[in-house]
A protein has these predicted regions:
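Hydrophobic beta-strand scaffold residues
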Residues: 27, 47, 113-114, 155, ...
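Hydrophobic residues within alpha-helices
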Residues: 16-17, 36, 102, 147, ...
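NAD(P)+-binding Rossmann beta1-loop-alpha1 motif at the extreme N-terminus of oxidoreductases
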Residues: 1-63
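Rossmann-fold NAD(P) dinucleotide-binding segment
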Residues: 51-112
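Helical "substrate-binding/catalytic lid" subdomain
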Residues: 162-280
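Rossmann-fold dinucleotide-binding core
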Residues: 4, 94-177
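Amphipathic alpha-helical hairpins
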Residues: 15, 53, 60, 66, ...
């Protein structure tokens, strides 16, 4: 049974704590909005009055906090109460730059700290599935590996570079946002054409474009723009999309159209659609 301090019991943090409690860990929680921490009390969590009280005596301290500033604030508050052998596991989505400074600064001061952001929903956290990304000192990772494996379906150690997991996390989130924006634009086209949104989604029960990330993405990363879908033809299709949407608000299509126009003006018209990335991969 692990002795755990947990800072930040919002939606994701609460899911993680529930999982820990079900497996028998002793968990002390703190949250700035105290009612969110107290909601875990009936499940067996001990609620601390201060962040320092939450970490006192804990072998492992987990954090799911909003941003870099709050992470740094909490770390300063809890330092005096940390056990000398405690390991801090930060699941917060933080900036690569902030994480790159934070990890060596704390480790250099004798505080064991590792960054481990996640790709999981609150329900996935409760169920112990999803992906945990970890970067930082290998020795610290090995010390917490078994605990992380109990929390999730997969743990991916991405290397010693302290900011790598933070970078990969925002890469993944960016794709989630692009997908949400793309779905919104599909609905805009559907509304402009008088097609119900639910019917528009039926296309993606047959056509699943996720494979493009690997197939076209690998070529783009190599700077290989040999055409399988010429950019000029893709731009024609973009015109059809914008015409279909009409006066309906679109999120990403106009920006993509502009990027296509810029790439065509620079001589990429006969290259592949992936040439919209030419400036960032060459």
């Amino acid at each position: 049974m692990a002795t755990v301090g947990f800072l930040g019991t919002g939606l994701l943090g609460s899911g993680m704590v529930e999982r820990m409690l079900r497996r028998g860990d002793a968990v002390t929680v703190w949250n700035r909005t105290a009612s969110k921490a107290r909601a875990l009390e009936p499940l067996g969590a001990r609620v601390a009055a201060t962040p320092g009280d939450a970490v006192a005596g804990a072998e492992h301290v987990h954090m799911t906090l909003p941003d870099d500033a709050v992470v740094d604030e909490m770390l300063e508050k809890v330092r005096p109460q940390l056990r000398t052998d405690a390991i801090i596991i930060d699941h917060s989505t933080t900036s690569p730059a902030g994480t790159k400074k934070r990890v060596p600064r704390l480790n250099g001061a004798g505080i064991k700290f590792i960054h481990a952001p996640v790709f999981m929903s609150p329900q996935m956290a409760r169920d112990g599935v999803g992906l945990v990304l970890v970067s930082g000192p290998r020795a610290i990772y090995e010390d917490v590996r078994s605990e992380l494996e109990k929390m999730t379906g997969e743990v991916w150690y991405v290397g010693e570079e302290p900011d790598r997991s933070a970078a990969y996390k925002i890469f993944g989130n960016s794709m989630l946002f692009v997908i949400a924006a793309g779905v919104s634009d599909v609905f805009a086209m559907a509304k402009g054409l008088g097609i119900p949104a639910a019917d528009a989604l039926a296309v993606f029960s047959k056509f699943q474009p996720g494979g493009v990330i690997k197939a076209r993405g690998e070529k783009m990363a190599r700077g290989d723009f040999s055409a399988t879908f010429e950019l000029t033809m893709a731009r024609k299709d973009m015109r059809l999309m914008l015409e279909a949407a009409g006066s309906q608000p679109t999120v990403v299509l106009p920006s993509i159209a502009k990027r296509m126009d810029d790439a065509i003006a620079k001589g990429h018209g006969q290259d592949d659609l992936g040439a919209i990335a030419a400036e960032v991969v060459r």
